[in-house]
A protein has these predicted regions:
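Hydrophobic beta-strand anchors of alpha/beta hydrolase catalytic cores
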Residues: 24-25, 55, 78
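Typically the conserved alpha-helix immediately C-terminal to a functionally engaged Cys/Sec
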Residues: 36-49
Length: 107
């Protein structure tokens, strides 16, 4: 598993999900203020959970196919995928402890 934040595309999304047990995906866009506010938290999660999960970002404007597949209608949306299945979804900007809690349940 990677130890850094990775940037997914429609082309790389499925392979990343298939090759990793747990993946946290931040669906975001550059124009979204709450998404920009969440970015440091996502970067911290990538460092702190290094070796345990893959933390990734997917720009919904550049990769609409995956966003549509996951029915992402509001951003930021953070989806936790375990064994290729969505197990948690957090919509909107939330406190850090909410993301940690979701991850701890599935490690």
């Amino acid at each position: 598993m990677g130890n850094e934040l990775i940037h997914l595309t429609d082309a790389t999304f499925q392979q990343t999900i298939d090759n990793n047990k747990i993946v946290l995906v931040d669906f975001w866009a550059g124009w979204c203020g709450p998404c920009r506010a969440l970015a440091p938290t996502i970067e911290e999660l990538a460092k702190e959970y290094s070796g345990k999960i893959v933390v990734a970002k997917l720009d919904v404007d550049e990769n609409p196919e995956t966003a549509e597949k996951f029915q992402v209608f509001s951003i930021p949306t953070v989806v936790l995928i375990k064994d290729r299945c969505e197990v948690e979804r957090i919509v909107g900007l939330c406190p850090r402890k909410q993301y940690d809690g979701a991850l701890q349940k599935h490690l």
